UniProtKB/Swiss-Prot annotation:
Family: Belongs to the SelWTH family. Selenoprotein W subfamily.
Organism of this sequence: Homo sapiens
Protein name per its UniProtKB record: Selenoprotein W
Gene: SELENOW
SUPFAM superfamilies: Thioredoxin-like (SSF52833)
Crosslink position(s): Cysteinyl-selenocysteine (Cys-Sec): C10-U13
Length: 87
């Protein structure tokens, strides 16, 4: 069964490309193992929130910024690997 990864991003801010970039990178890292969905907010929220199996792992609103560095990406990878290991 695929692991749920949900990204809520600011649609009004034009963050869809950042979401699609992250989605592709995660799909390349975990081919066929993730169910990734994104939701763009219609109003300007500044959101770029990433949840793995319902748990908030990355939050731009809480100061994490975008997933724009290798260390931020590896934090997501570690959370996904842990969730997959729990099955």
């Amino acid at each position: 069964m695929a692991l749920a990864v949900r990204v809520v991003y600011c649609g009004a801010u034009g963050y869809k490309s950042k979401y699609l970039q992250l989605k592709k990178k995660l799909e390349d890292e975990f081919p066929g193992r993730l169910d990734i969905c994104g939701e763009g907010t219609p109003q300007a929220t500044g959101f770029f929130e990433v949840m793995v199996a319902g748990k908030l792992i990355h939050s731009k609103k809480k100061g994490d910024g975008y997933v724009d560095t290798e260390s931020k990406f590896l934090k997501l990878v570690a959370a996904i690997k842990a969730a997959l290991a729990q099955g």
